[in-house]
């Protein structure tokens, strides 16, 4: 079965024994270990002089730093949204519009709204979706599904980004 161990810190894995060593001296056996590591900015960013409390301070609507013409997006930016690709994509779109306007000698009214979605696998070809908006007058969060229709949406979401980012069709690998 799956076990949840809140407030217990894993500090090392012993793959030969299939055991996670816990900071409190305990051990947790595992067959497959899935974890999210601590989020932190890369050393080069930390040493750049741009960070405050480990992250780069930005205007949360435009991603401009306190240094005119310098923008920070994604995992290094102190924005107030989860550090996930869907949010970084939104950061990039807004920052790119502001950078392009600066190059053209104009201004941009583009603002980040803190919107993102996350697909959740439920098994049996069913997928759910969390749809959240963190900023603005209409802050919201909703769990939609699960359904087989959302499985198709998830596949389209992934393939459209692969085409846009990498210029190639991203088809599911047959099981």
PLM features: residue spans?
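Rossmann-like dinucleotide-binding cores of NAD(P)H-dependent redox enzymes
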Residues: 1-8, 106-108
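A conserved short coil-to-beta-strand element within the FAD-binding core of flavoproteins
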Residues: 6-18
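Glycine-rich beta-alpha junction loops
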Residues: 10, 32-40, 116, 124-126
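Hydrophobic residues embedded in beta-strands of well-ordered beta-sheets
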Residues: 18-20, 127
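FAD-site-proximal beta/loop scaffold in flavoenzymes
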Residues: 27-93, 97-101
